Amino acid sequence: MGYKIAVVGATGNVGREMLNILDERQFPVDTLAVLASRRSLGTEVSFGDKTLKTQDLDTFDFSGWDIALFAVGSDATKKYAPVAAKAGCLVIDNSSLYRYDPEIPLIVPEVNADAIEGYKNKMIIANPNCSTAQMVVALKPLHDRATIKRVVVSTYQSVSGAGKEGIDELWDQTKSIYNPVDNKPPKKFTKQIAFNVIPHIDVFMDDGSTKEEWKMVAETKKIVDKAIKVTATCVRVPVFVGHAESINIEFEDHLDEDEARDILRESPGVMVIDKREDGGYVTPIECVGDYATFISRIRQDSTIDNGLNLWCVSDNLRKGAALNAVQIAEVYVNRILSKR
């Protein structure tokens, strides 16, 4: 049996990746609509061996459609997601708009798939922030074993997390380094991103943290356990795709590195590559196009009781966005739609 699926924002980085993943995972699609704003109307996108033309989101009727995967900004989501939901179409939203609404589930299927039942509240399910998604996949199985008290995370986030404009800016600035006549000043980012790192993602909050850092705190609590203390420093780095995170974890109970490694090896969505030798770890460039969240550099933290350090890498356009959304859709099909 197939289902009627709409991809909203099909011409963007995440929207195109959603189409790729729907095809790769052989999602049971009966009818597929690719939607975009009027300025992108008629743009062609690929779905498997098919070429589809985008339709106008503004005039699209969601009645009779099963699932809409939203890959647009919060403003467009605010306008169109309620329309789709009211028509009886489940919205899986990749923006930040609904993540902190207590009535809307925030789901990472490897972690809290049971929260899918909350779809009944508003017919909307939220996708987490890219940096949160990969981290909680690593944290949850360890939390189940030894109960996490506190997490300290520093992120190394690629420019694709800022959209196509971020990718273009890194590319243009990198070229201009070798051609000073064609200087490219910052537009998307606050400072030059080429050959640089920027400790600033999203807007600053009153306490000195950034919105990106606040998101990691709030979302980890909502997805995993509200009792976990989290502090984050989020940094933009000159990498096109793939986010990395250095994570320090303090547990209630002792958990040695060997047991942690074994637990993670058996955990869904996780790939452990952790050899104590040159190259025995995963870097962002190696995770591009992969579904897994890669874990390396697992080791005890000798400065605290019950502490561990690890390195976490994932494709932010996949697990951090498009893949997670499709996985949520799979849970909805398997647990809800197929039972009707």
Listing of model-derived features with the role each one plays in the protein:
Residues 68, 159-340:
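Charged docking surfaces used in two-component/phosphorelay signaling
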